[in-house]
Design a protein with these regions (language model features):
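Amphipathic alpha-helical packing segments from all-alpha helical-bundle domains
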Residues: 97-125, 129-134, 159-170
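Hydrophobic alpha-helical connector segments
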Residues: 45, 49, 59-87, 98-99, ...
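Alpha-helical structural segments
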Residues: 6, 10, 23, 37-60, ...
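Short linear capping/connector segments at secondary-structure termini
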Residues: 91-99, 149
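HTH DNA-binding helix-turn interface
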Residues: 15-19, 29-45
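Short, well-structured alpha-helical segments
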Residues: 21, 25, 72, 128-136
């Protein structure tokens, strides 16, 4: 079986999720004898399977819950799926191919489900889309840290992620109201003395 080694520069230079999905597709190709030209179909297969599996799990996690509790359950389930099925979740997290209706439909079903969960938390439109991007980044970030063991001294990734989700959920009402304030760096007069930057918040 072909072996791949990725350097830190490789990871930082490109999407790690895409690299993982591509690597798995290449392995499938080498085992099945498929030509490189059919790798798109393999990526499509992985993405569809990932979307459908994840959506089924999220529906089960949401059952009997509403609002913040449903959102937290969905977030924890997404993280567990990413840890247990890294290749499928990586394929599912990728943007759907615009020229593949089946792939796009599976993506839109999962996307609509997540927007519906966020709607119960009072978010819609651009606010919901932004919150969803934040949640995806939060989930994937913690998964990557856990897989690579990069959070030194952390006793429990489960507890750390749960606290992060609590903070995320607690901030949703402020985000939904549009009262988000930008933190803009402003050099201080004593920057040369090593005091760094001070920050001021300004309304949008």
């Amino acid at each position: 079986m072909k072996s791949h080694r990725f350097t830190v520069d490789d990871i930082l230079a490109t999407s790690w999720d895409r690299k993982l999905a591509t690597d798995l597709a290449e392995e499938i190709g080498s085992c099945t004898g498929e030509k490189l030209g059919t790798l798109f179909e393999m990526r499509r297969f992985l993405a569809l399977k990932g979307y459908r599996e994840l959506l089924q799990l999220l529906r089960g996690a949401r059952e009997g819950k509403n609002g913040d509790h449903a959102l937290a359950a969905v977030a924890h389930t997404t993280r567990r799926y990413a840890l247990e099925r890294p290749a499928l979740s990586a394929a599912a997290f990728r943007t759907a191919a615009v020229d593949c209706p089946e792939w796009r439909e599976a993506y839109e079903r999962l996307h609509a489900f997540m927007l519906d969960v966020l709607a119960e938390c009072g978010l819609s439109g651009e606010a919901a889309e932004n919150a969803l991007n934040m949640l995806r980044s939060l989930v994937r970030g913690y998964v990557l840290h856990e897989v690579m063991h990069t959070l030194v001294g952390l006793e429990s990734y489960d507890d750390a992620f749960d606290k992060a989700i609590q903070v995320f959920v607690a901030g949703l009402p402020l985000f939904a109201s549009g009262r988000i304030r930008h933190l803009q760096p402003r050099p201080t007069e004593t920057l040369e003395q090593g005091e760094g930057y001070s920050f001021r918040s300004e309304p949008t």
